[in-house]
Curated annotation (Swiss-Prot):
It comes from the Bacteria. It comes from Desulfitobacterium hafniense (strain DSM 10664 / DCB-2). Its cofactor is pyruvate. Pfam families: AdoMet_dc (PF02675). The lineage of its organism: Bacteria, Bacillati, Bacillota, Clostridia, Eubacteriales. This is S-adenosylmethionine decarboxylase proenzyme. The record marks 123-124 as: Cleavage (non-hydrolytic). One of its GO terms (cellular component) is cytosol.
Length: 276
């Protein structure tokens, strides 16, 4: 869905509103043996390494219409990766003295100007961190990725929401969106939000709304929007790593399904739960 601005809103000077989308996604699987668990962690670590994450956040920057100032990326030992990208609404550089917003992206190879880093370090940025984990009890392994897209000015991180869902295809999503600060119209009146929204679901494509069960917690007067999403359909084949469903007995299938559903419910509701 397009981010629609409020009608007839004319601002004075720069748009000082800060808009932040926090996107937390979870992938859950059953890995029967220690070897399977190690293989799952290794697979996730390679699938979502720093280079792959950099490609994802670079596309996020393109989608929201931001220019890249700098990129820092790191793979961690024994597992995990992170990427931090500084972005700006307008291109800043010696070949763009007029701050033309349609000029080419400023790449990490060229590097940002020092004052650009200072100006945008705590406001316009994209970060992603990954957290693979497993536990020997129960055979459950999980992968979490946290993505934060924070912008100031007219660009909106909500534009990247569907791309992030497509990129990770997660089992569970916890999304938070908030707007902070204020800007002013030409008459000096404060503007605390500059676009229409009553739920993050407004910006989720129908094909994903059909796939996920969703619940909202909205504090509109504080410009806080919270949406949780969990896949509606459960196919055990999609959650087995290193083991085929046909290799399991009916009783094993039932037990594994119960463990996985319990794990997913606990993550979705954010609390430990009795046996399902």
């Amino acid at each position: 869905m397009e981010v629609k601005p409020l009608k007839k809103l004319r601002l004075y000077g720069f748009n000082n509103l800060t808009k932040t989308l926090s996107f937390n996604m979870y992938d859950i699987c059953y890995a029967k043996t220690p070897e399977h668990r190690d293989a799952y962690i290794q697979y996730i670590d390679e699938e979502y390494n720093a280079q792959r994450l950099t490609s994802i956040v670079t596309e996020v920057a393109r989608i929201v219409g931001a220019n890249i100032l700098n990129i820092a990326k790191q793979d961690y030992d024994p597992q995990g990766a992170s990427v931090t990208m500084l972005i700006a609404e307008e291109h800043l550089g010696p070949e763009n003295p007029d701050n033309d917003p349609f000029s080419p992206v400023y790449t990490d190879k060229e590097g940002p100007l020092p004052d650009a880093v200072v100006a945008h370090l705590d406001k316009s940025h994209i970060t992603v961190h990954t957290y693979p984990e497993s536990h020997p009890h129960g055979g459950i392994s999980t992968f979490r990725a946290d993505i934060d897209v924070s912008t100031c000015g007219q660009i909106s991180p909500l534009k990247a929401l569907n791309f992030l869902i497509e990129s990770f295809a997660p089992d569970i999503i916890v999304a938070d969106y908030r707007v902070r600060g204020f800007t002013r119209d030409v008459d000096g009146k404060k503007v605390f939000i500059d676009h229409k929204i009553n739920s993050i679901q407004n910006y989720v494509d129908r094909k994903y709304r059909d796939l996920y069960q969703m619940i909202d917690v909205t504090v509109f007067q504080e410009y806080i929007f919270h949406t949780k999403m969990i896949l509606k359909d459960f196919d055990l084949d999609n959650y087995l790593f290193g083991t085929a469903k046909k290799e399991l007995s009916i009783n094993d299938k039932r037990k594994i399904k119960q463990r996985l559903k319990k794990e997913m419910a606990e993550i979705f509701y954010g609390k430990n739960m009795p046996r399902i």
